[in-house]
Curated annotation (Swiss-Prot):
ATP binds at residue 229. Keywords: Aminoacyl-tRNA synthetase, ATP-binding, Cytoplasm, Ligase, Nucleotide-binding, Protein biosynthesis, RNA-binding. Belongs to the class-I aminoacyl-tRNA synthetase family. TyrS type 2 subfamily. A motif ('KMSKS' region) lies at residues 226-230. GO terms for biological process: tyrosyl-tRNA aminoacylation. CDD domains: S4, TyrRS_core. This is Tyrosine--tRNA ligase. Pfam families: tRNA-synt_1b. The gene is tyrS. It comes from Xylella fastidiosa (strain 9a5c). The keyword Protein biosynthesis applies. Catalyzes the attachment of tyrosine to tRNA(Tyr) in a two-step reaction: tyrosine is first activated by ATP to form Tyr-AMP and then transferred to the acceptor end of tRNA(Tyr). PANTHER family: TYROSINE--TRNA LIGASE (PTHR11766:SF1), TYROSYL-TRNA SYNTHETASE (PTHR11766).
Length: 418
């Protein structure tokens, strides 16, 4: 297999779509280092595993000798990306955006090679753009074309407001590709419209249009929704190693393969096939595969010693020989009058449904702080903090809070047996 063919195979792994593949192949055959761009709007502090799907692909391009551009959208972050939204996003102040951006700069090199990375801010060019220039940019696209976007179309049909600045967002993101002379732009599948806008604008400005590579959106810990801080189903890349291990070990077996495909550098596609076969034949416990993934993630964000220590700590806890204080604390929002045990088991992610929680209770497989419980009506109120467990290895250390509370709770065991 030729060098270009090997490169294409690596680039294709985990990708959802490449537009246009023949253009990418032609540029790779040119032998020159390509400029690979991906933009990140710092609308919240800190990066999580969902962000690293793109970062991992950028790192693969670096390993092939290409230059990547980690673009911080400090200008676009103040506008707010309307992608996938059914309402207008609340704009952030420039101060908030810059504060969030600083956390990105600190963390991005846990994945990327610093020597092959340009960190850029799109305020570099938009901060100098005049009102006339912005109007000229807006004149390069039509409202009808904008309304072809699924999210805009739905809002238009349902008579939900679309503010004019939201129409500017795809144009502004597209202009970034002109300013950076991007050869390839990476983005999530939900960004395809914006990425194609970059191609169109580059062509309009006499530049070769960029290749668009979309990556799938990583499902969060629940295995259903996109990983998101607002949903609480995420693993932050600067979380303590024991937290990364514990959360990774809780994901479902089906989700495990998805995460390996999108997050692992060390487990090859061929090895995944072999591992899947071994698990299917019950020759290998899925837990061992998750441990490999957890070890790789902690090693990447910290080092090998931290990974070994975290896994040893996790194993000690699950075998009853360790300290529960090592476990991450999961805060769960509940109503002011509390929640019953069945709901707590599902909210914590220990059970996928109320019916499964009930089944485990009937099997006497549920423990609260080490004590077997089978009362589905056991009631927990805000302030409860403890270890809940299903079986030997499925557990969560939780604290119940209400959305309006952020202070410390008065001393209470938090269990209401009435």
């Amino acid at each position: 297999m030729s060098l270009v063919s090997n490169s294409l195979a690596l680039i294709e792994r985990g990708a959802n779509e490449i537009l246009k593949f023949d253009e990418l192949e032609r540029r790779l055959r040119s032998g020159r280092p390509l400029r690979i761009k991906a933009g990140f709007d710092p609308t919240a502090p800190d990066l999580h595993l969902g962000h690293t799907v793109l970062l991992n692909k950028m790192r693969q391009f670096q390993e092939l000798g290409h230059q990547v551009i980690f673009l911080i959208g400090d200008f676009t972050g103040m506008i707010g990306d309307p992608t996938g939204k059914n309402v207008t996003r609340k704009p952030l102040s420039h101060e908030d955006v810059l504060a969030n951006a600083r956390t990105y700069e600190d963390q991005v090199f846990k994945v990327l090679d610093r020597t092959l990375t340009e960190v850029r801010f799109n305020s570099e060019w938009f901060g100098k753009m005049s009102a006339v220039d912005m109007i000229k940019l807006a004149a390069q696209h039509t409202v009808a074309r904008m309304l072809e976007r699924d999210d805009f179309a739905k809002r238009f049909v349902s008579q939900q407001p679309i503010v004019i600045h939201e129409f500017l967002y795809p144009l502004i993101q597209g202009y970034d590709s002109i300013a950076l002379r991007a050869d390839v732009e990476l983005g999530g599948t939900d960004q395809k419209f914006n990425l194609l806008m970059g191609r169109a604008l580059q062509e309009h400005h006499g530049q070769p249009p960029q290749v668009v590579l979309t990556m799938p959106l990583l499902e969060g810990l629940d295995g259903v929704a996109k990983m998101s801080k607002s949903l609480g189903n995420y693993i932050g890349i600067k979380e303590p190693p024991i937290d990364i291990v514990t959360k990774t070990m809780k994901i479902g077996d089906d989700l495990m393969w998805r995460w390996i495909e999108l997050l692992s550098f060390k487990i090859s596609a061929a090895e995944v096939v072999a591992l899947r076969e071994a698990v299917a034949k019950s020759e290998l416990n899925p837990r061992e595969v998750k441990l490999r993934l957890a070890h790789e993630l902690v090693s990447r964000f910290y080092d090998n010693a931290a990974a070994e220590k975290a896994i040893a700590g996790w194993q000690a806890v699950v075998t009853g020989q360790g300290n529960n204080n090592l476990l991450p604390l999961q805060k769960i929002n509940v109503p002011a009058d509390g929640v019953r045990l069945v709901a707590l088991l599902t909210k914590s992610g220990l059970a996928p449904s109320n019916s499964e929680a009930m089944r485990k209770l009937k099997e006497r497989a549920v423990r609260v702080d080490g004590i077997v419980v089978d009362d589905a009506h056991l009631h927990f109120v805000p302030g409860f903090e403890g270890l809940i467990q299903i079986g030997k290895r499925n557990f969560a250390k939780v604290r119940l809070v209400t959305s309006s509370e952020s202070h410390d709770f008065p001393e209470s065991n938090g269990i209401d047996k009435s």
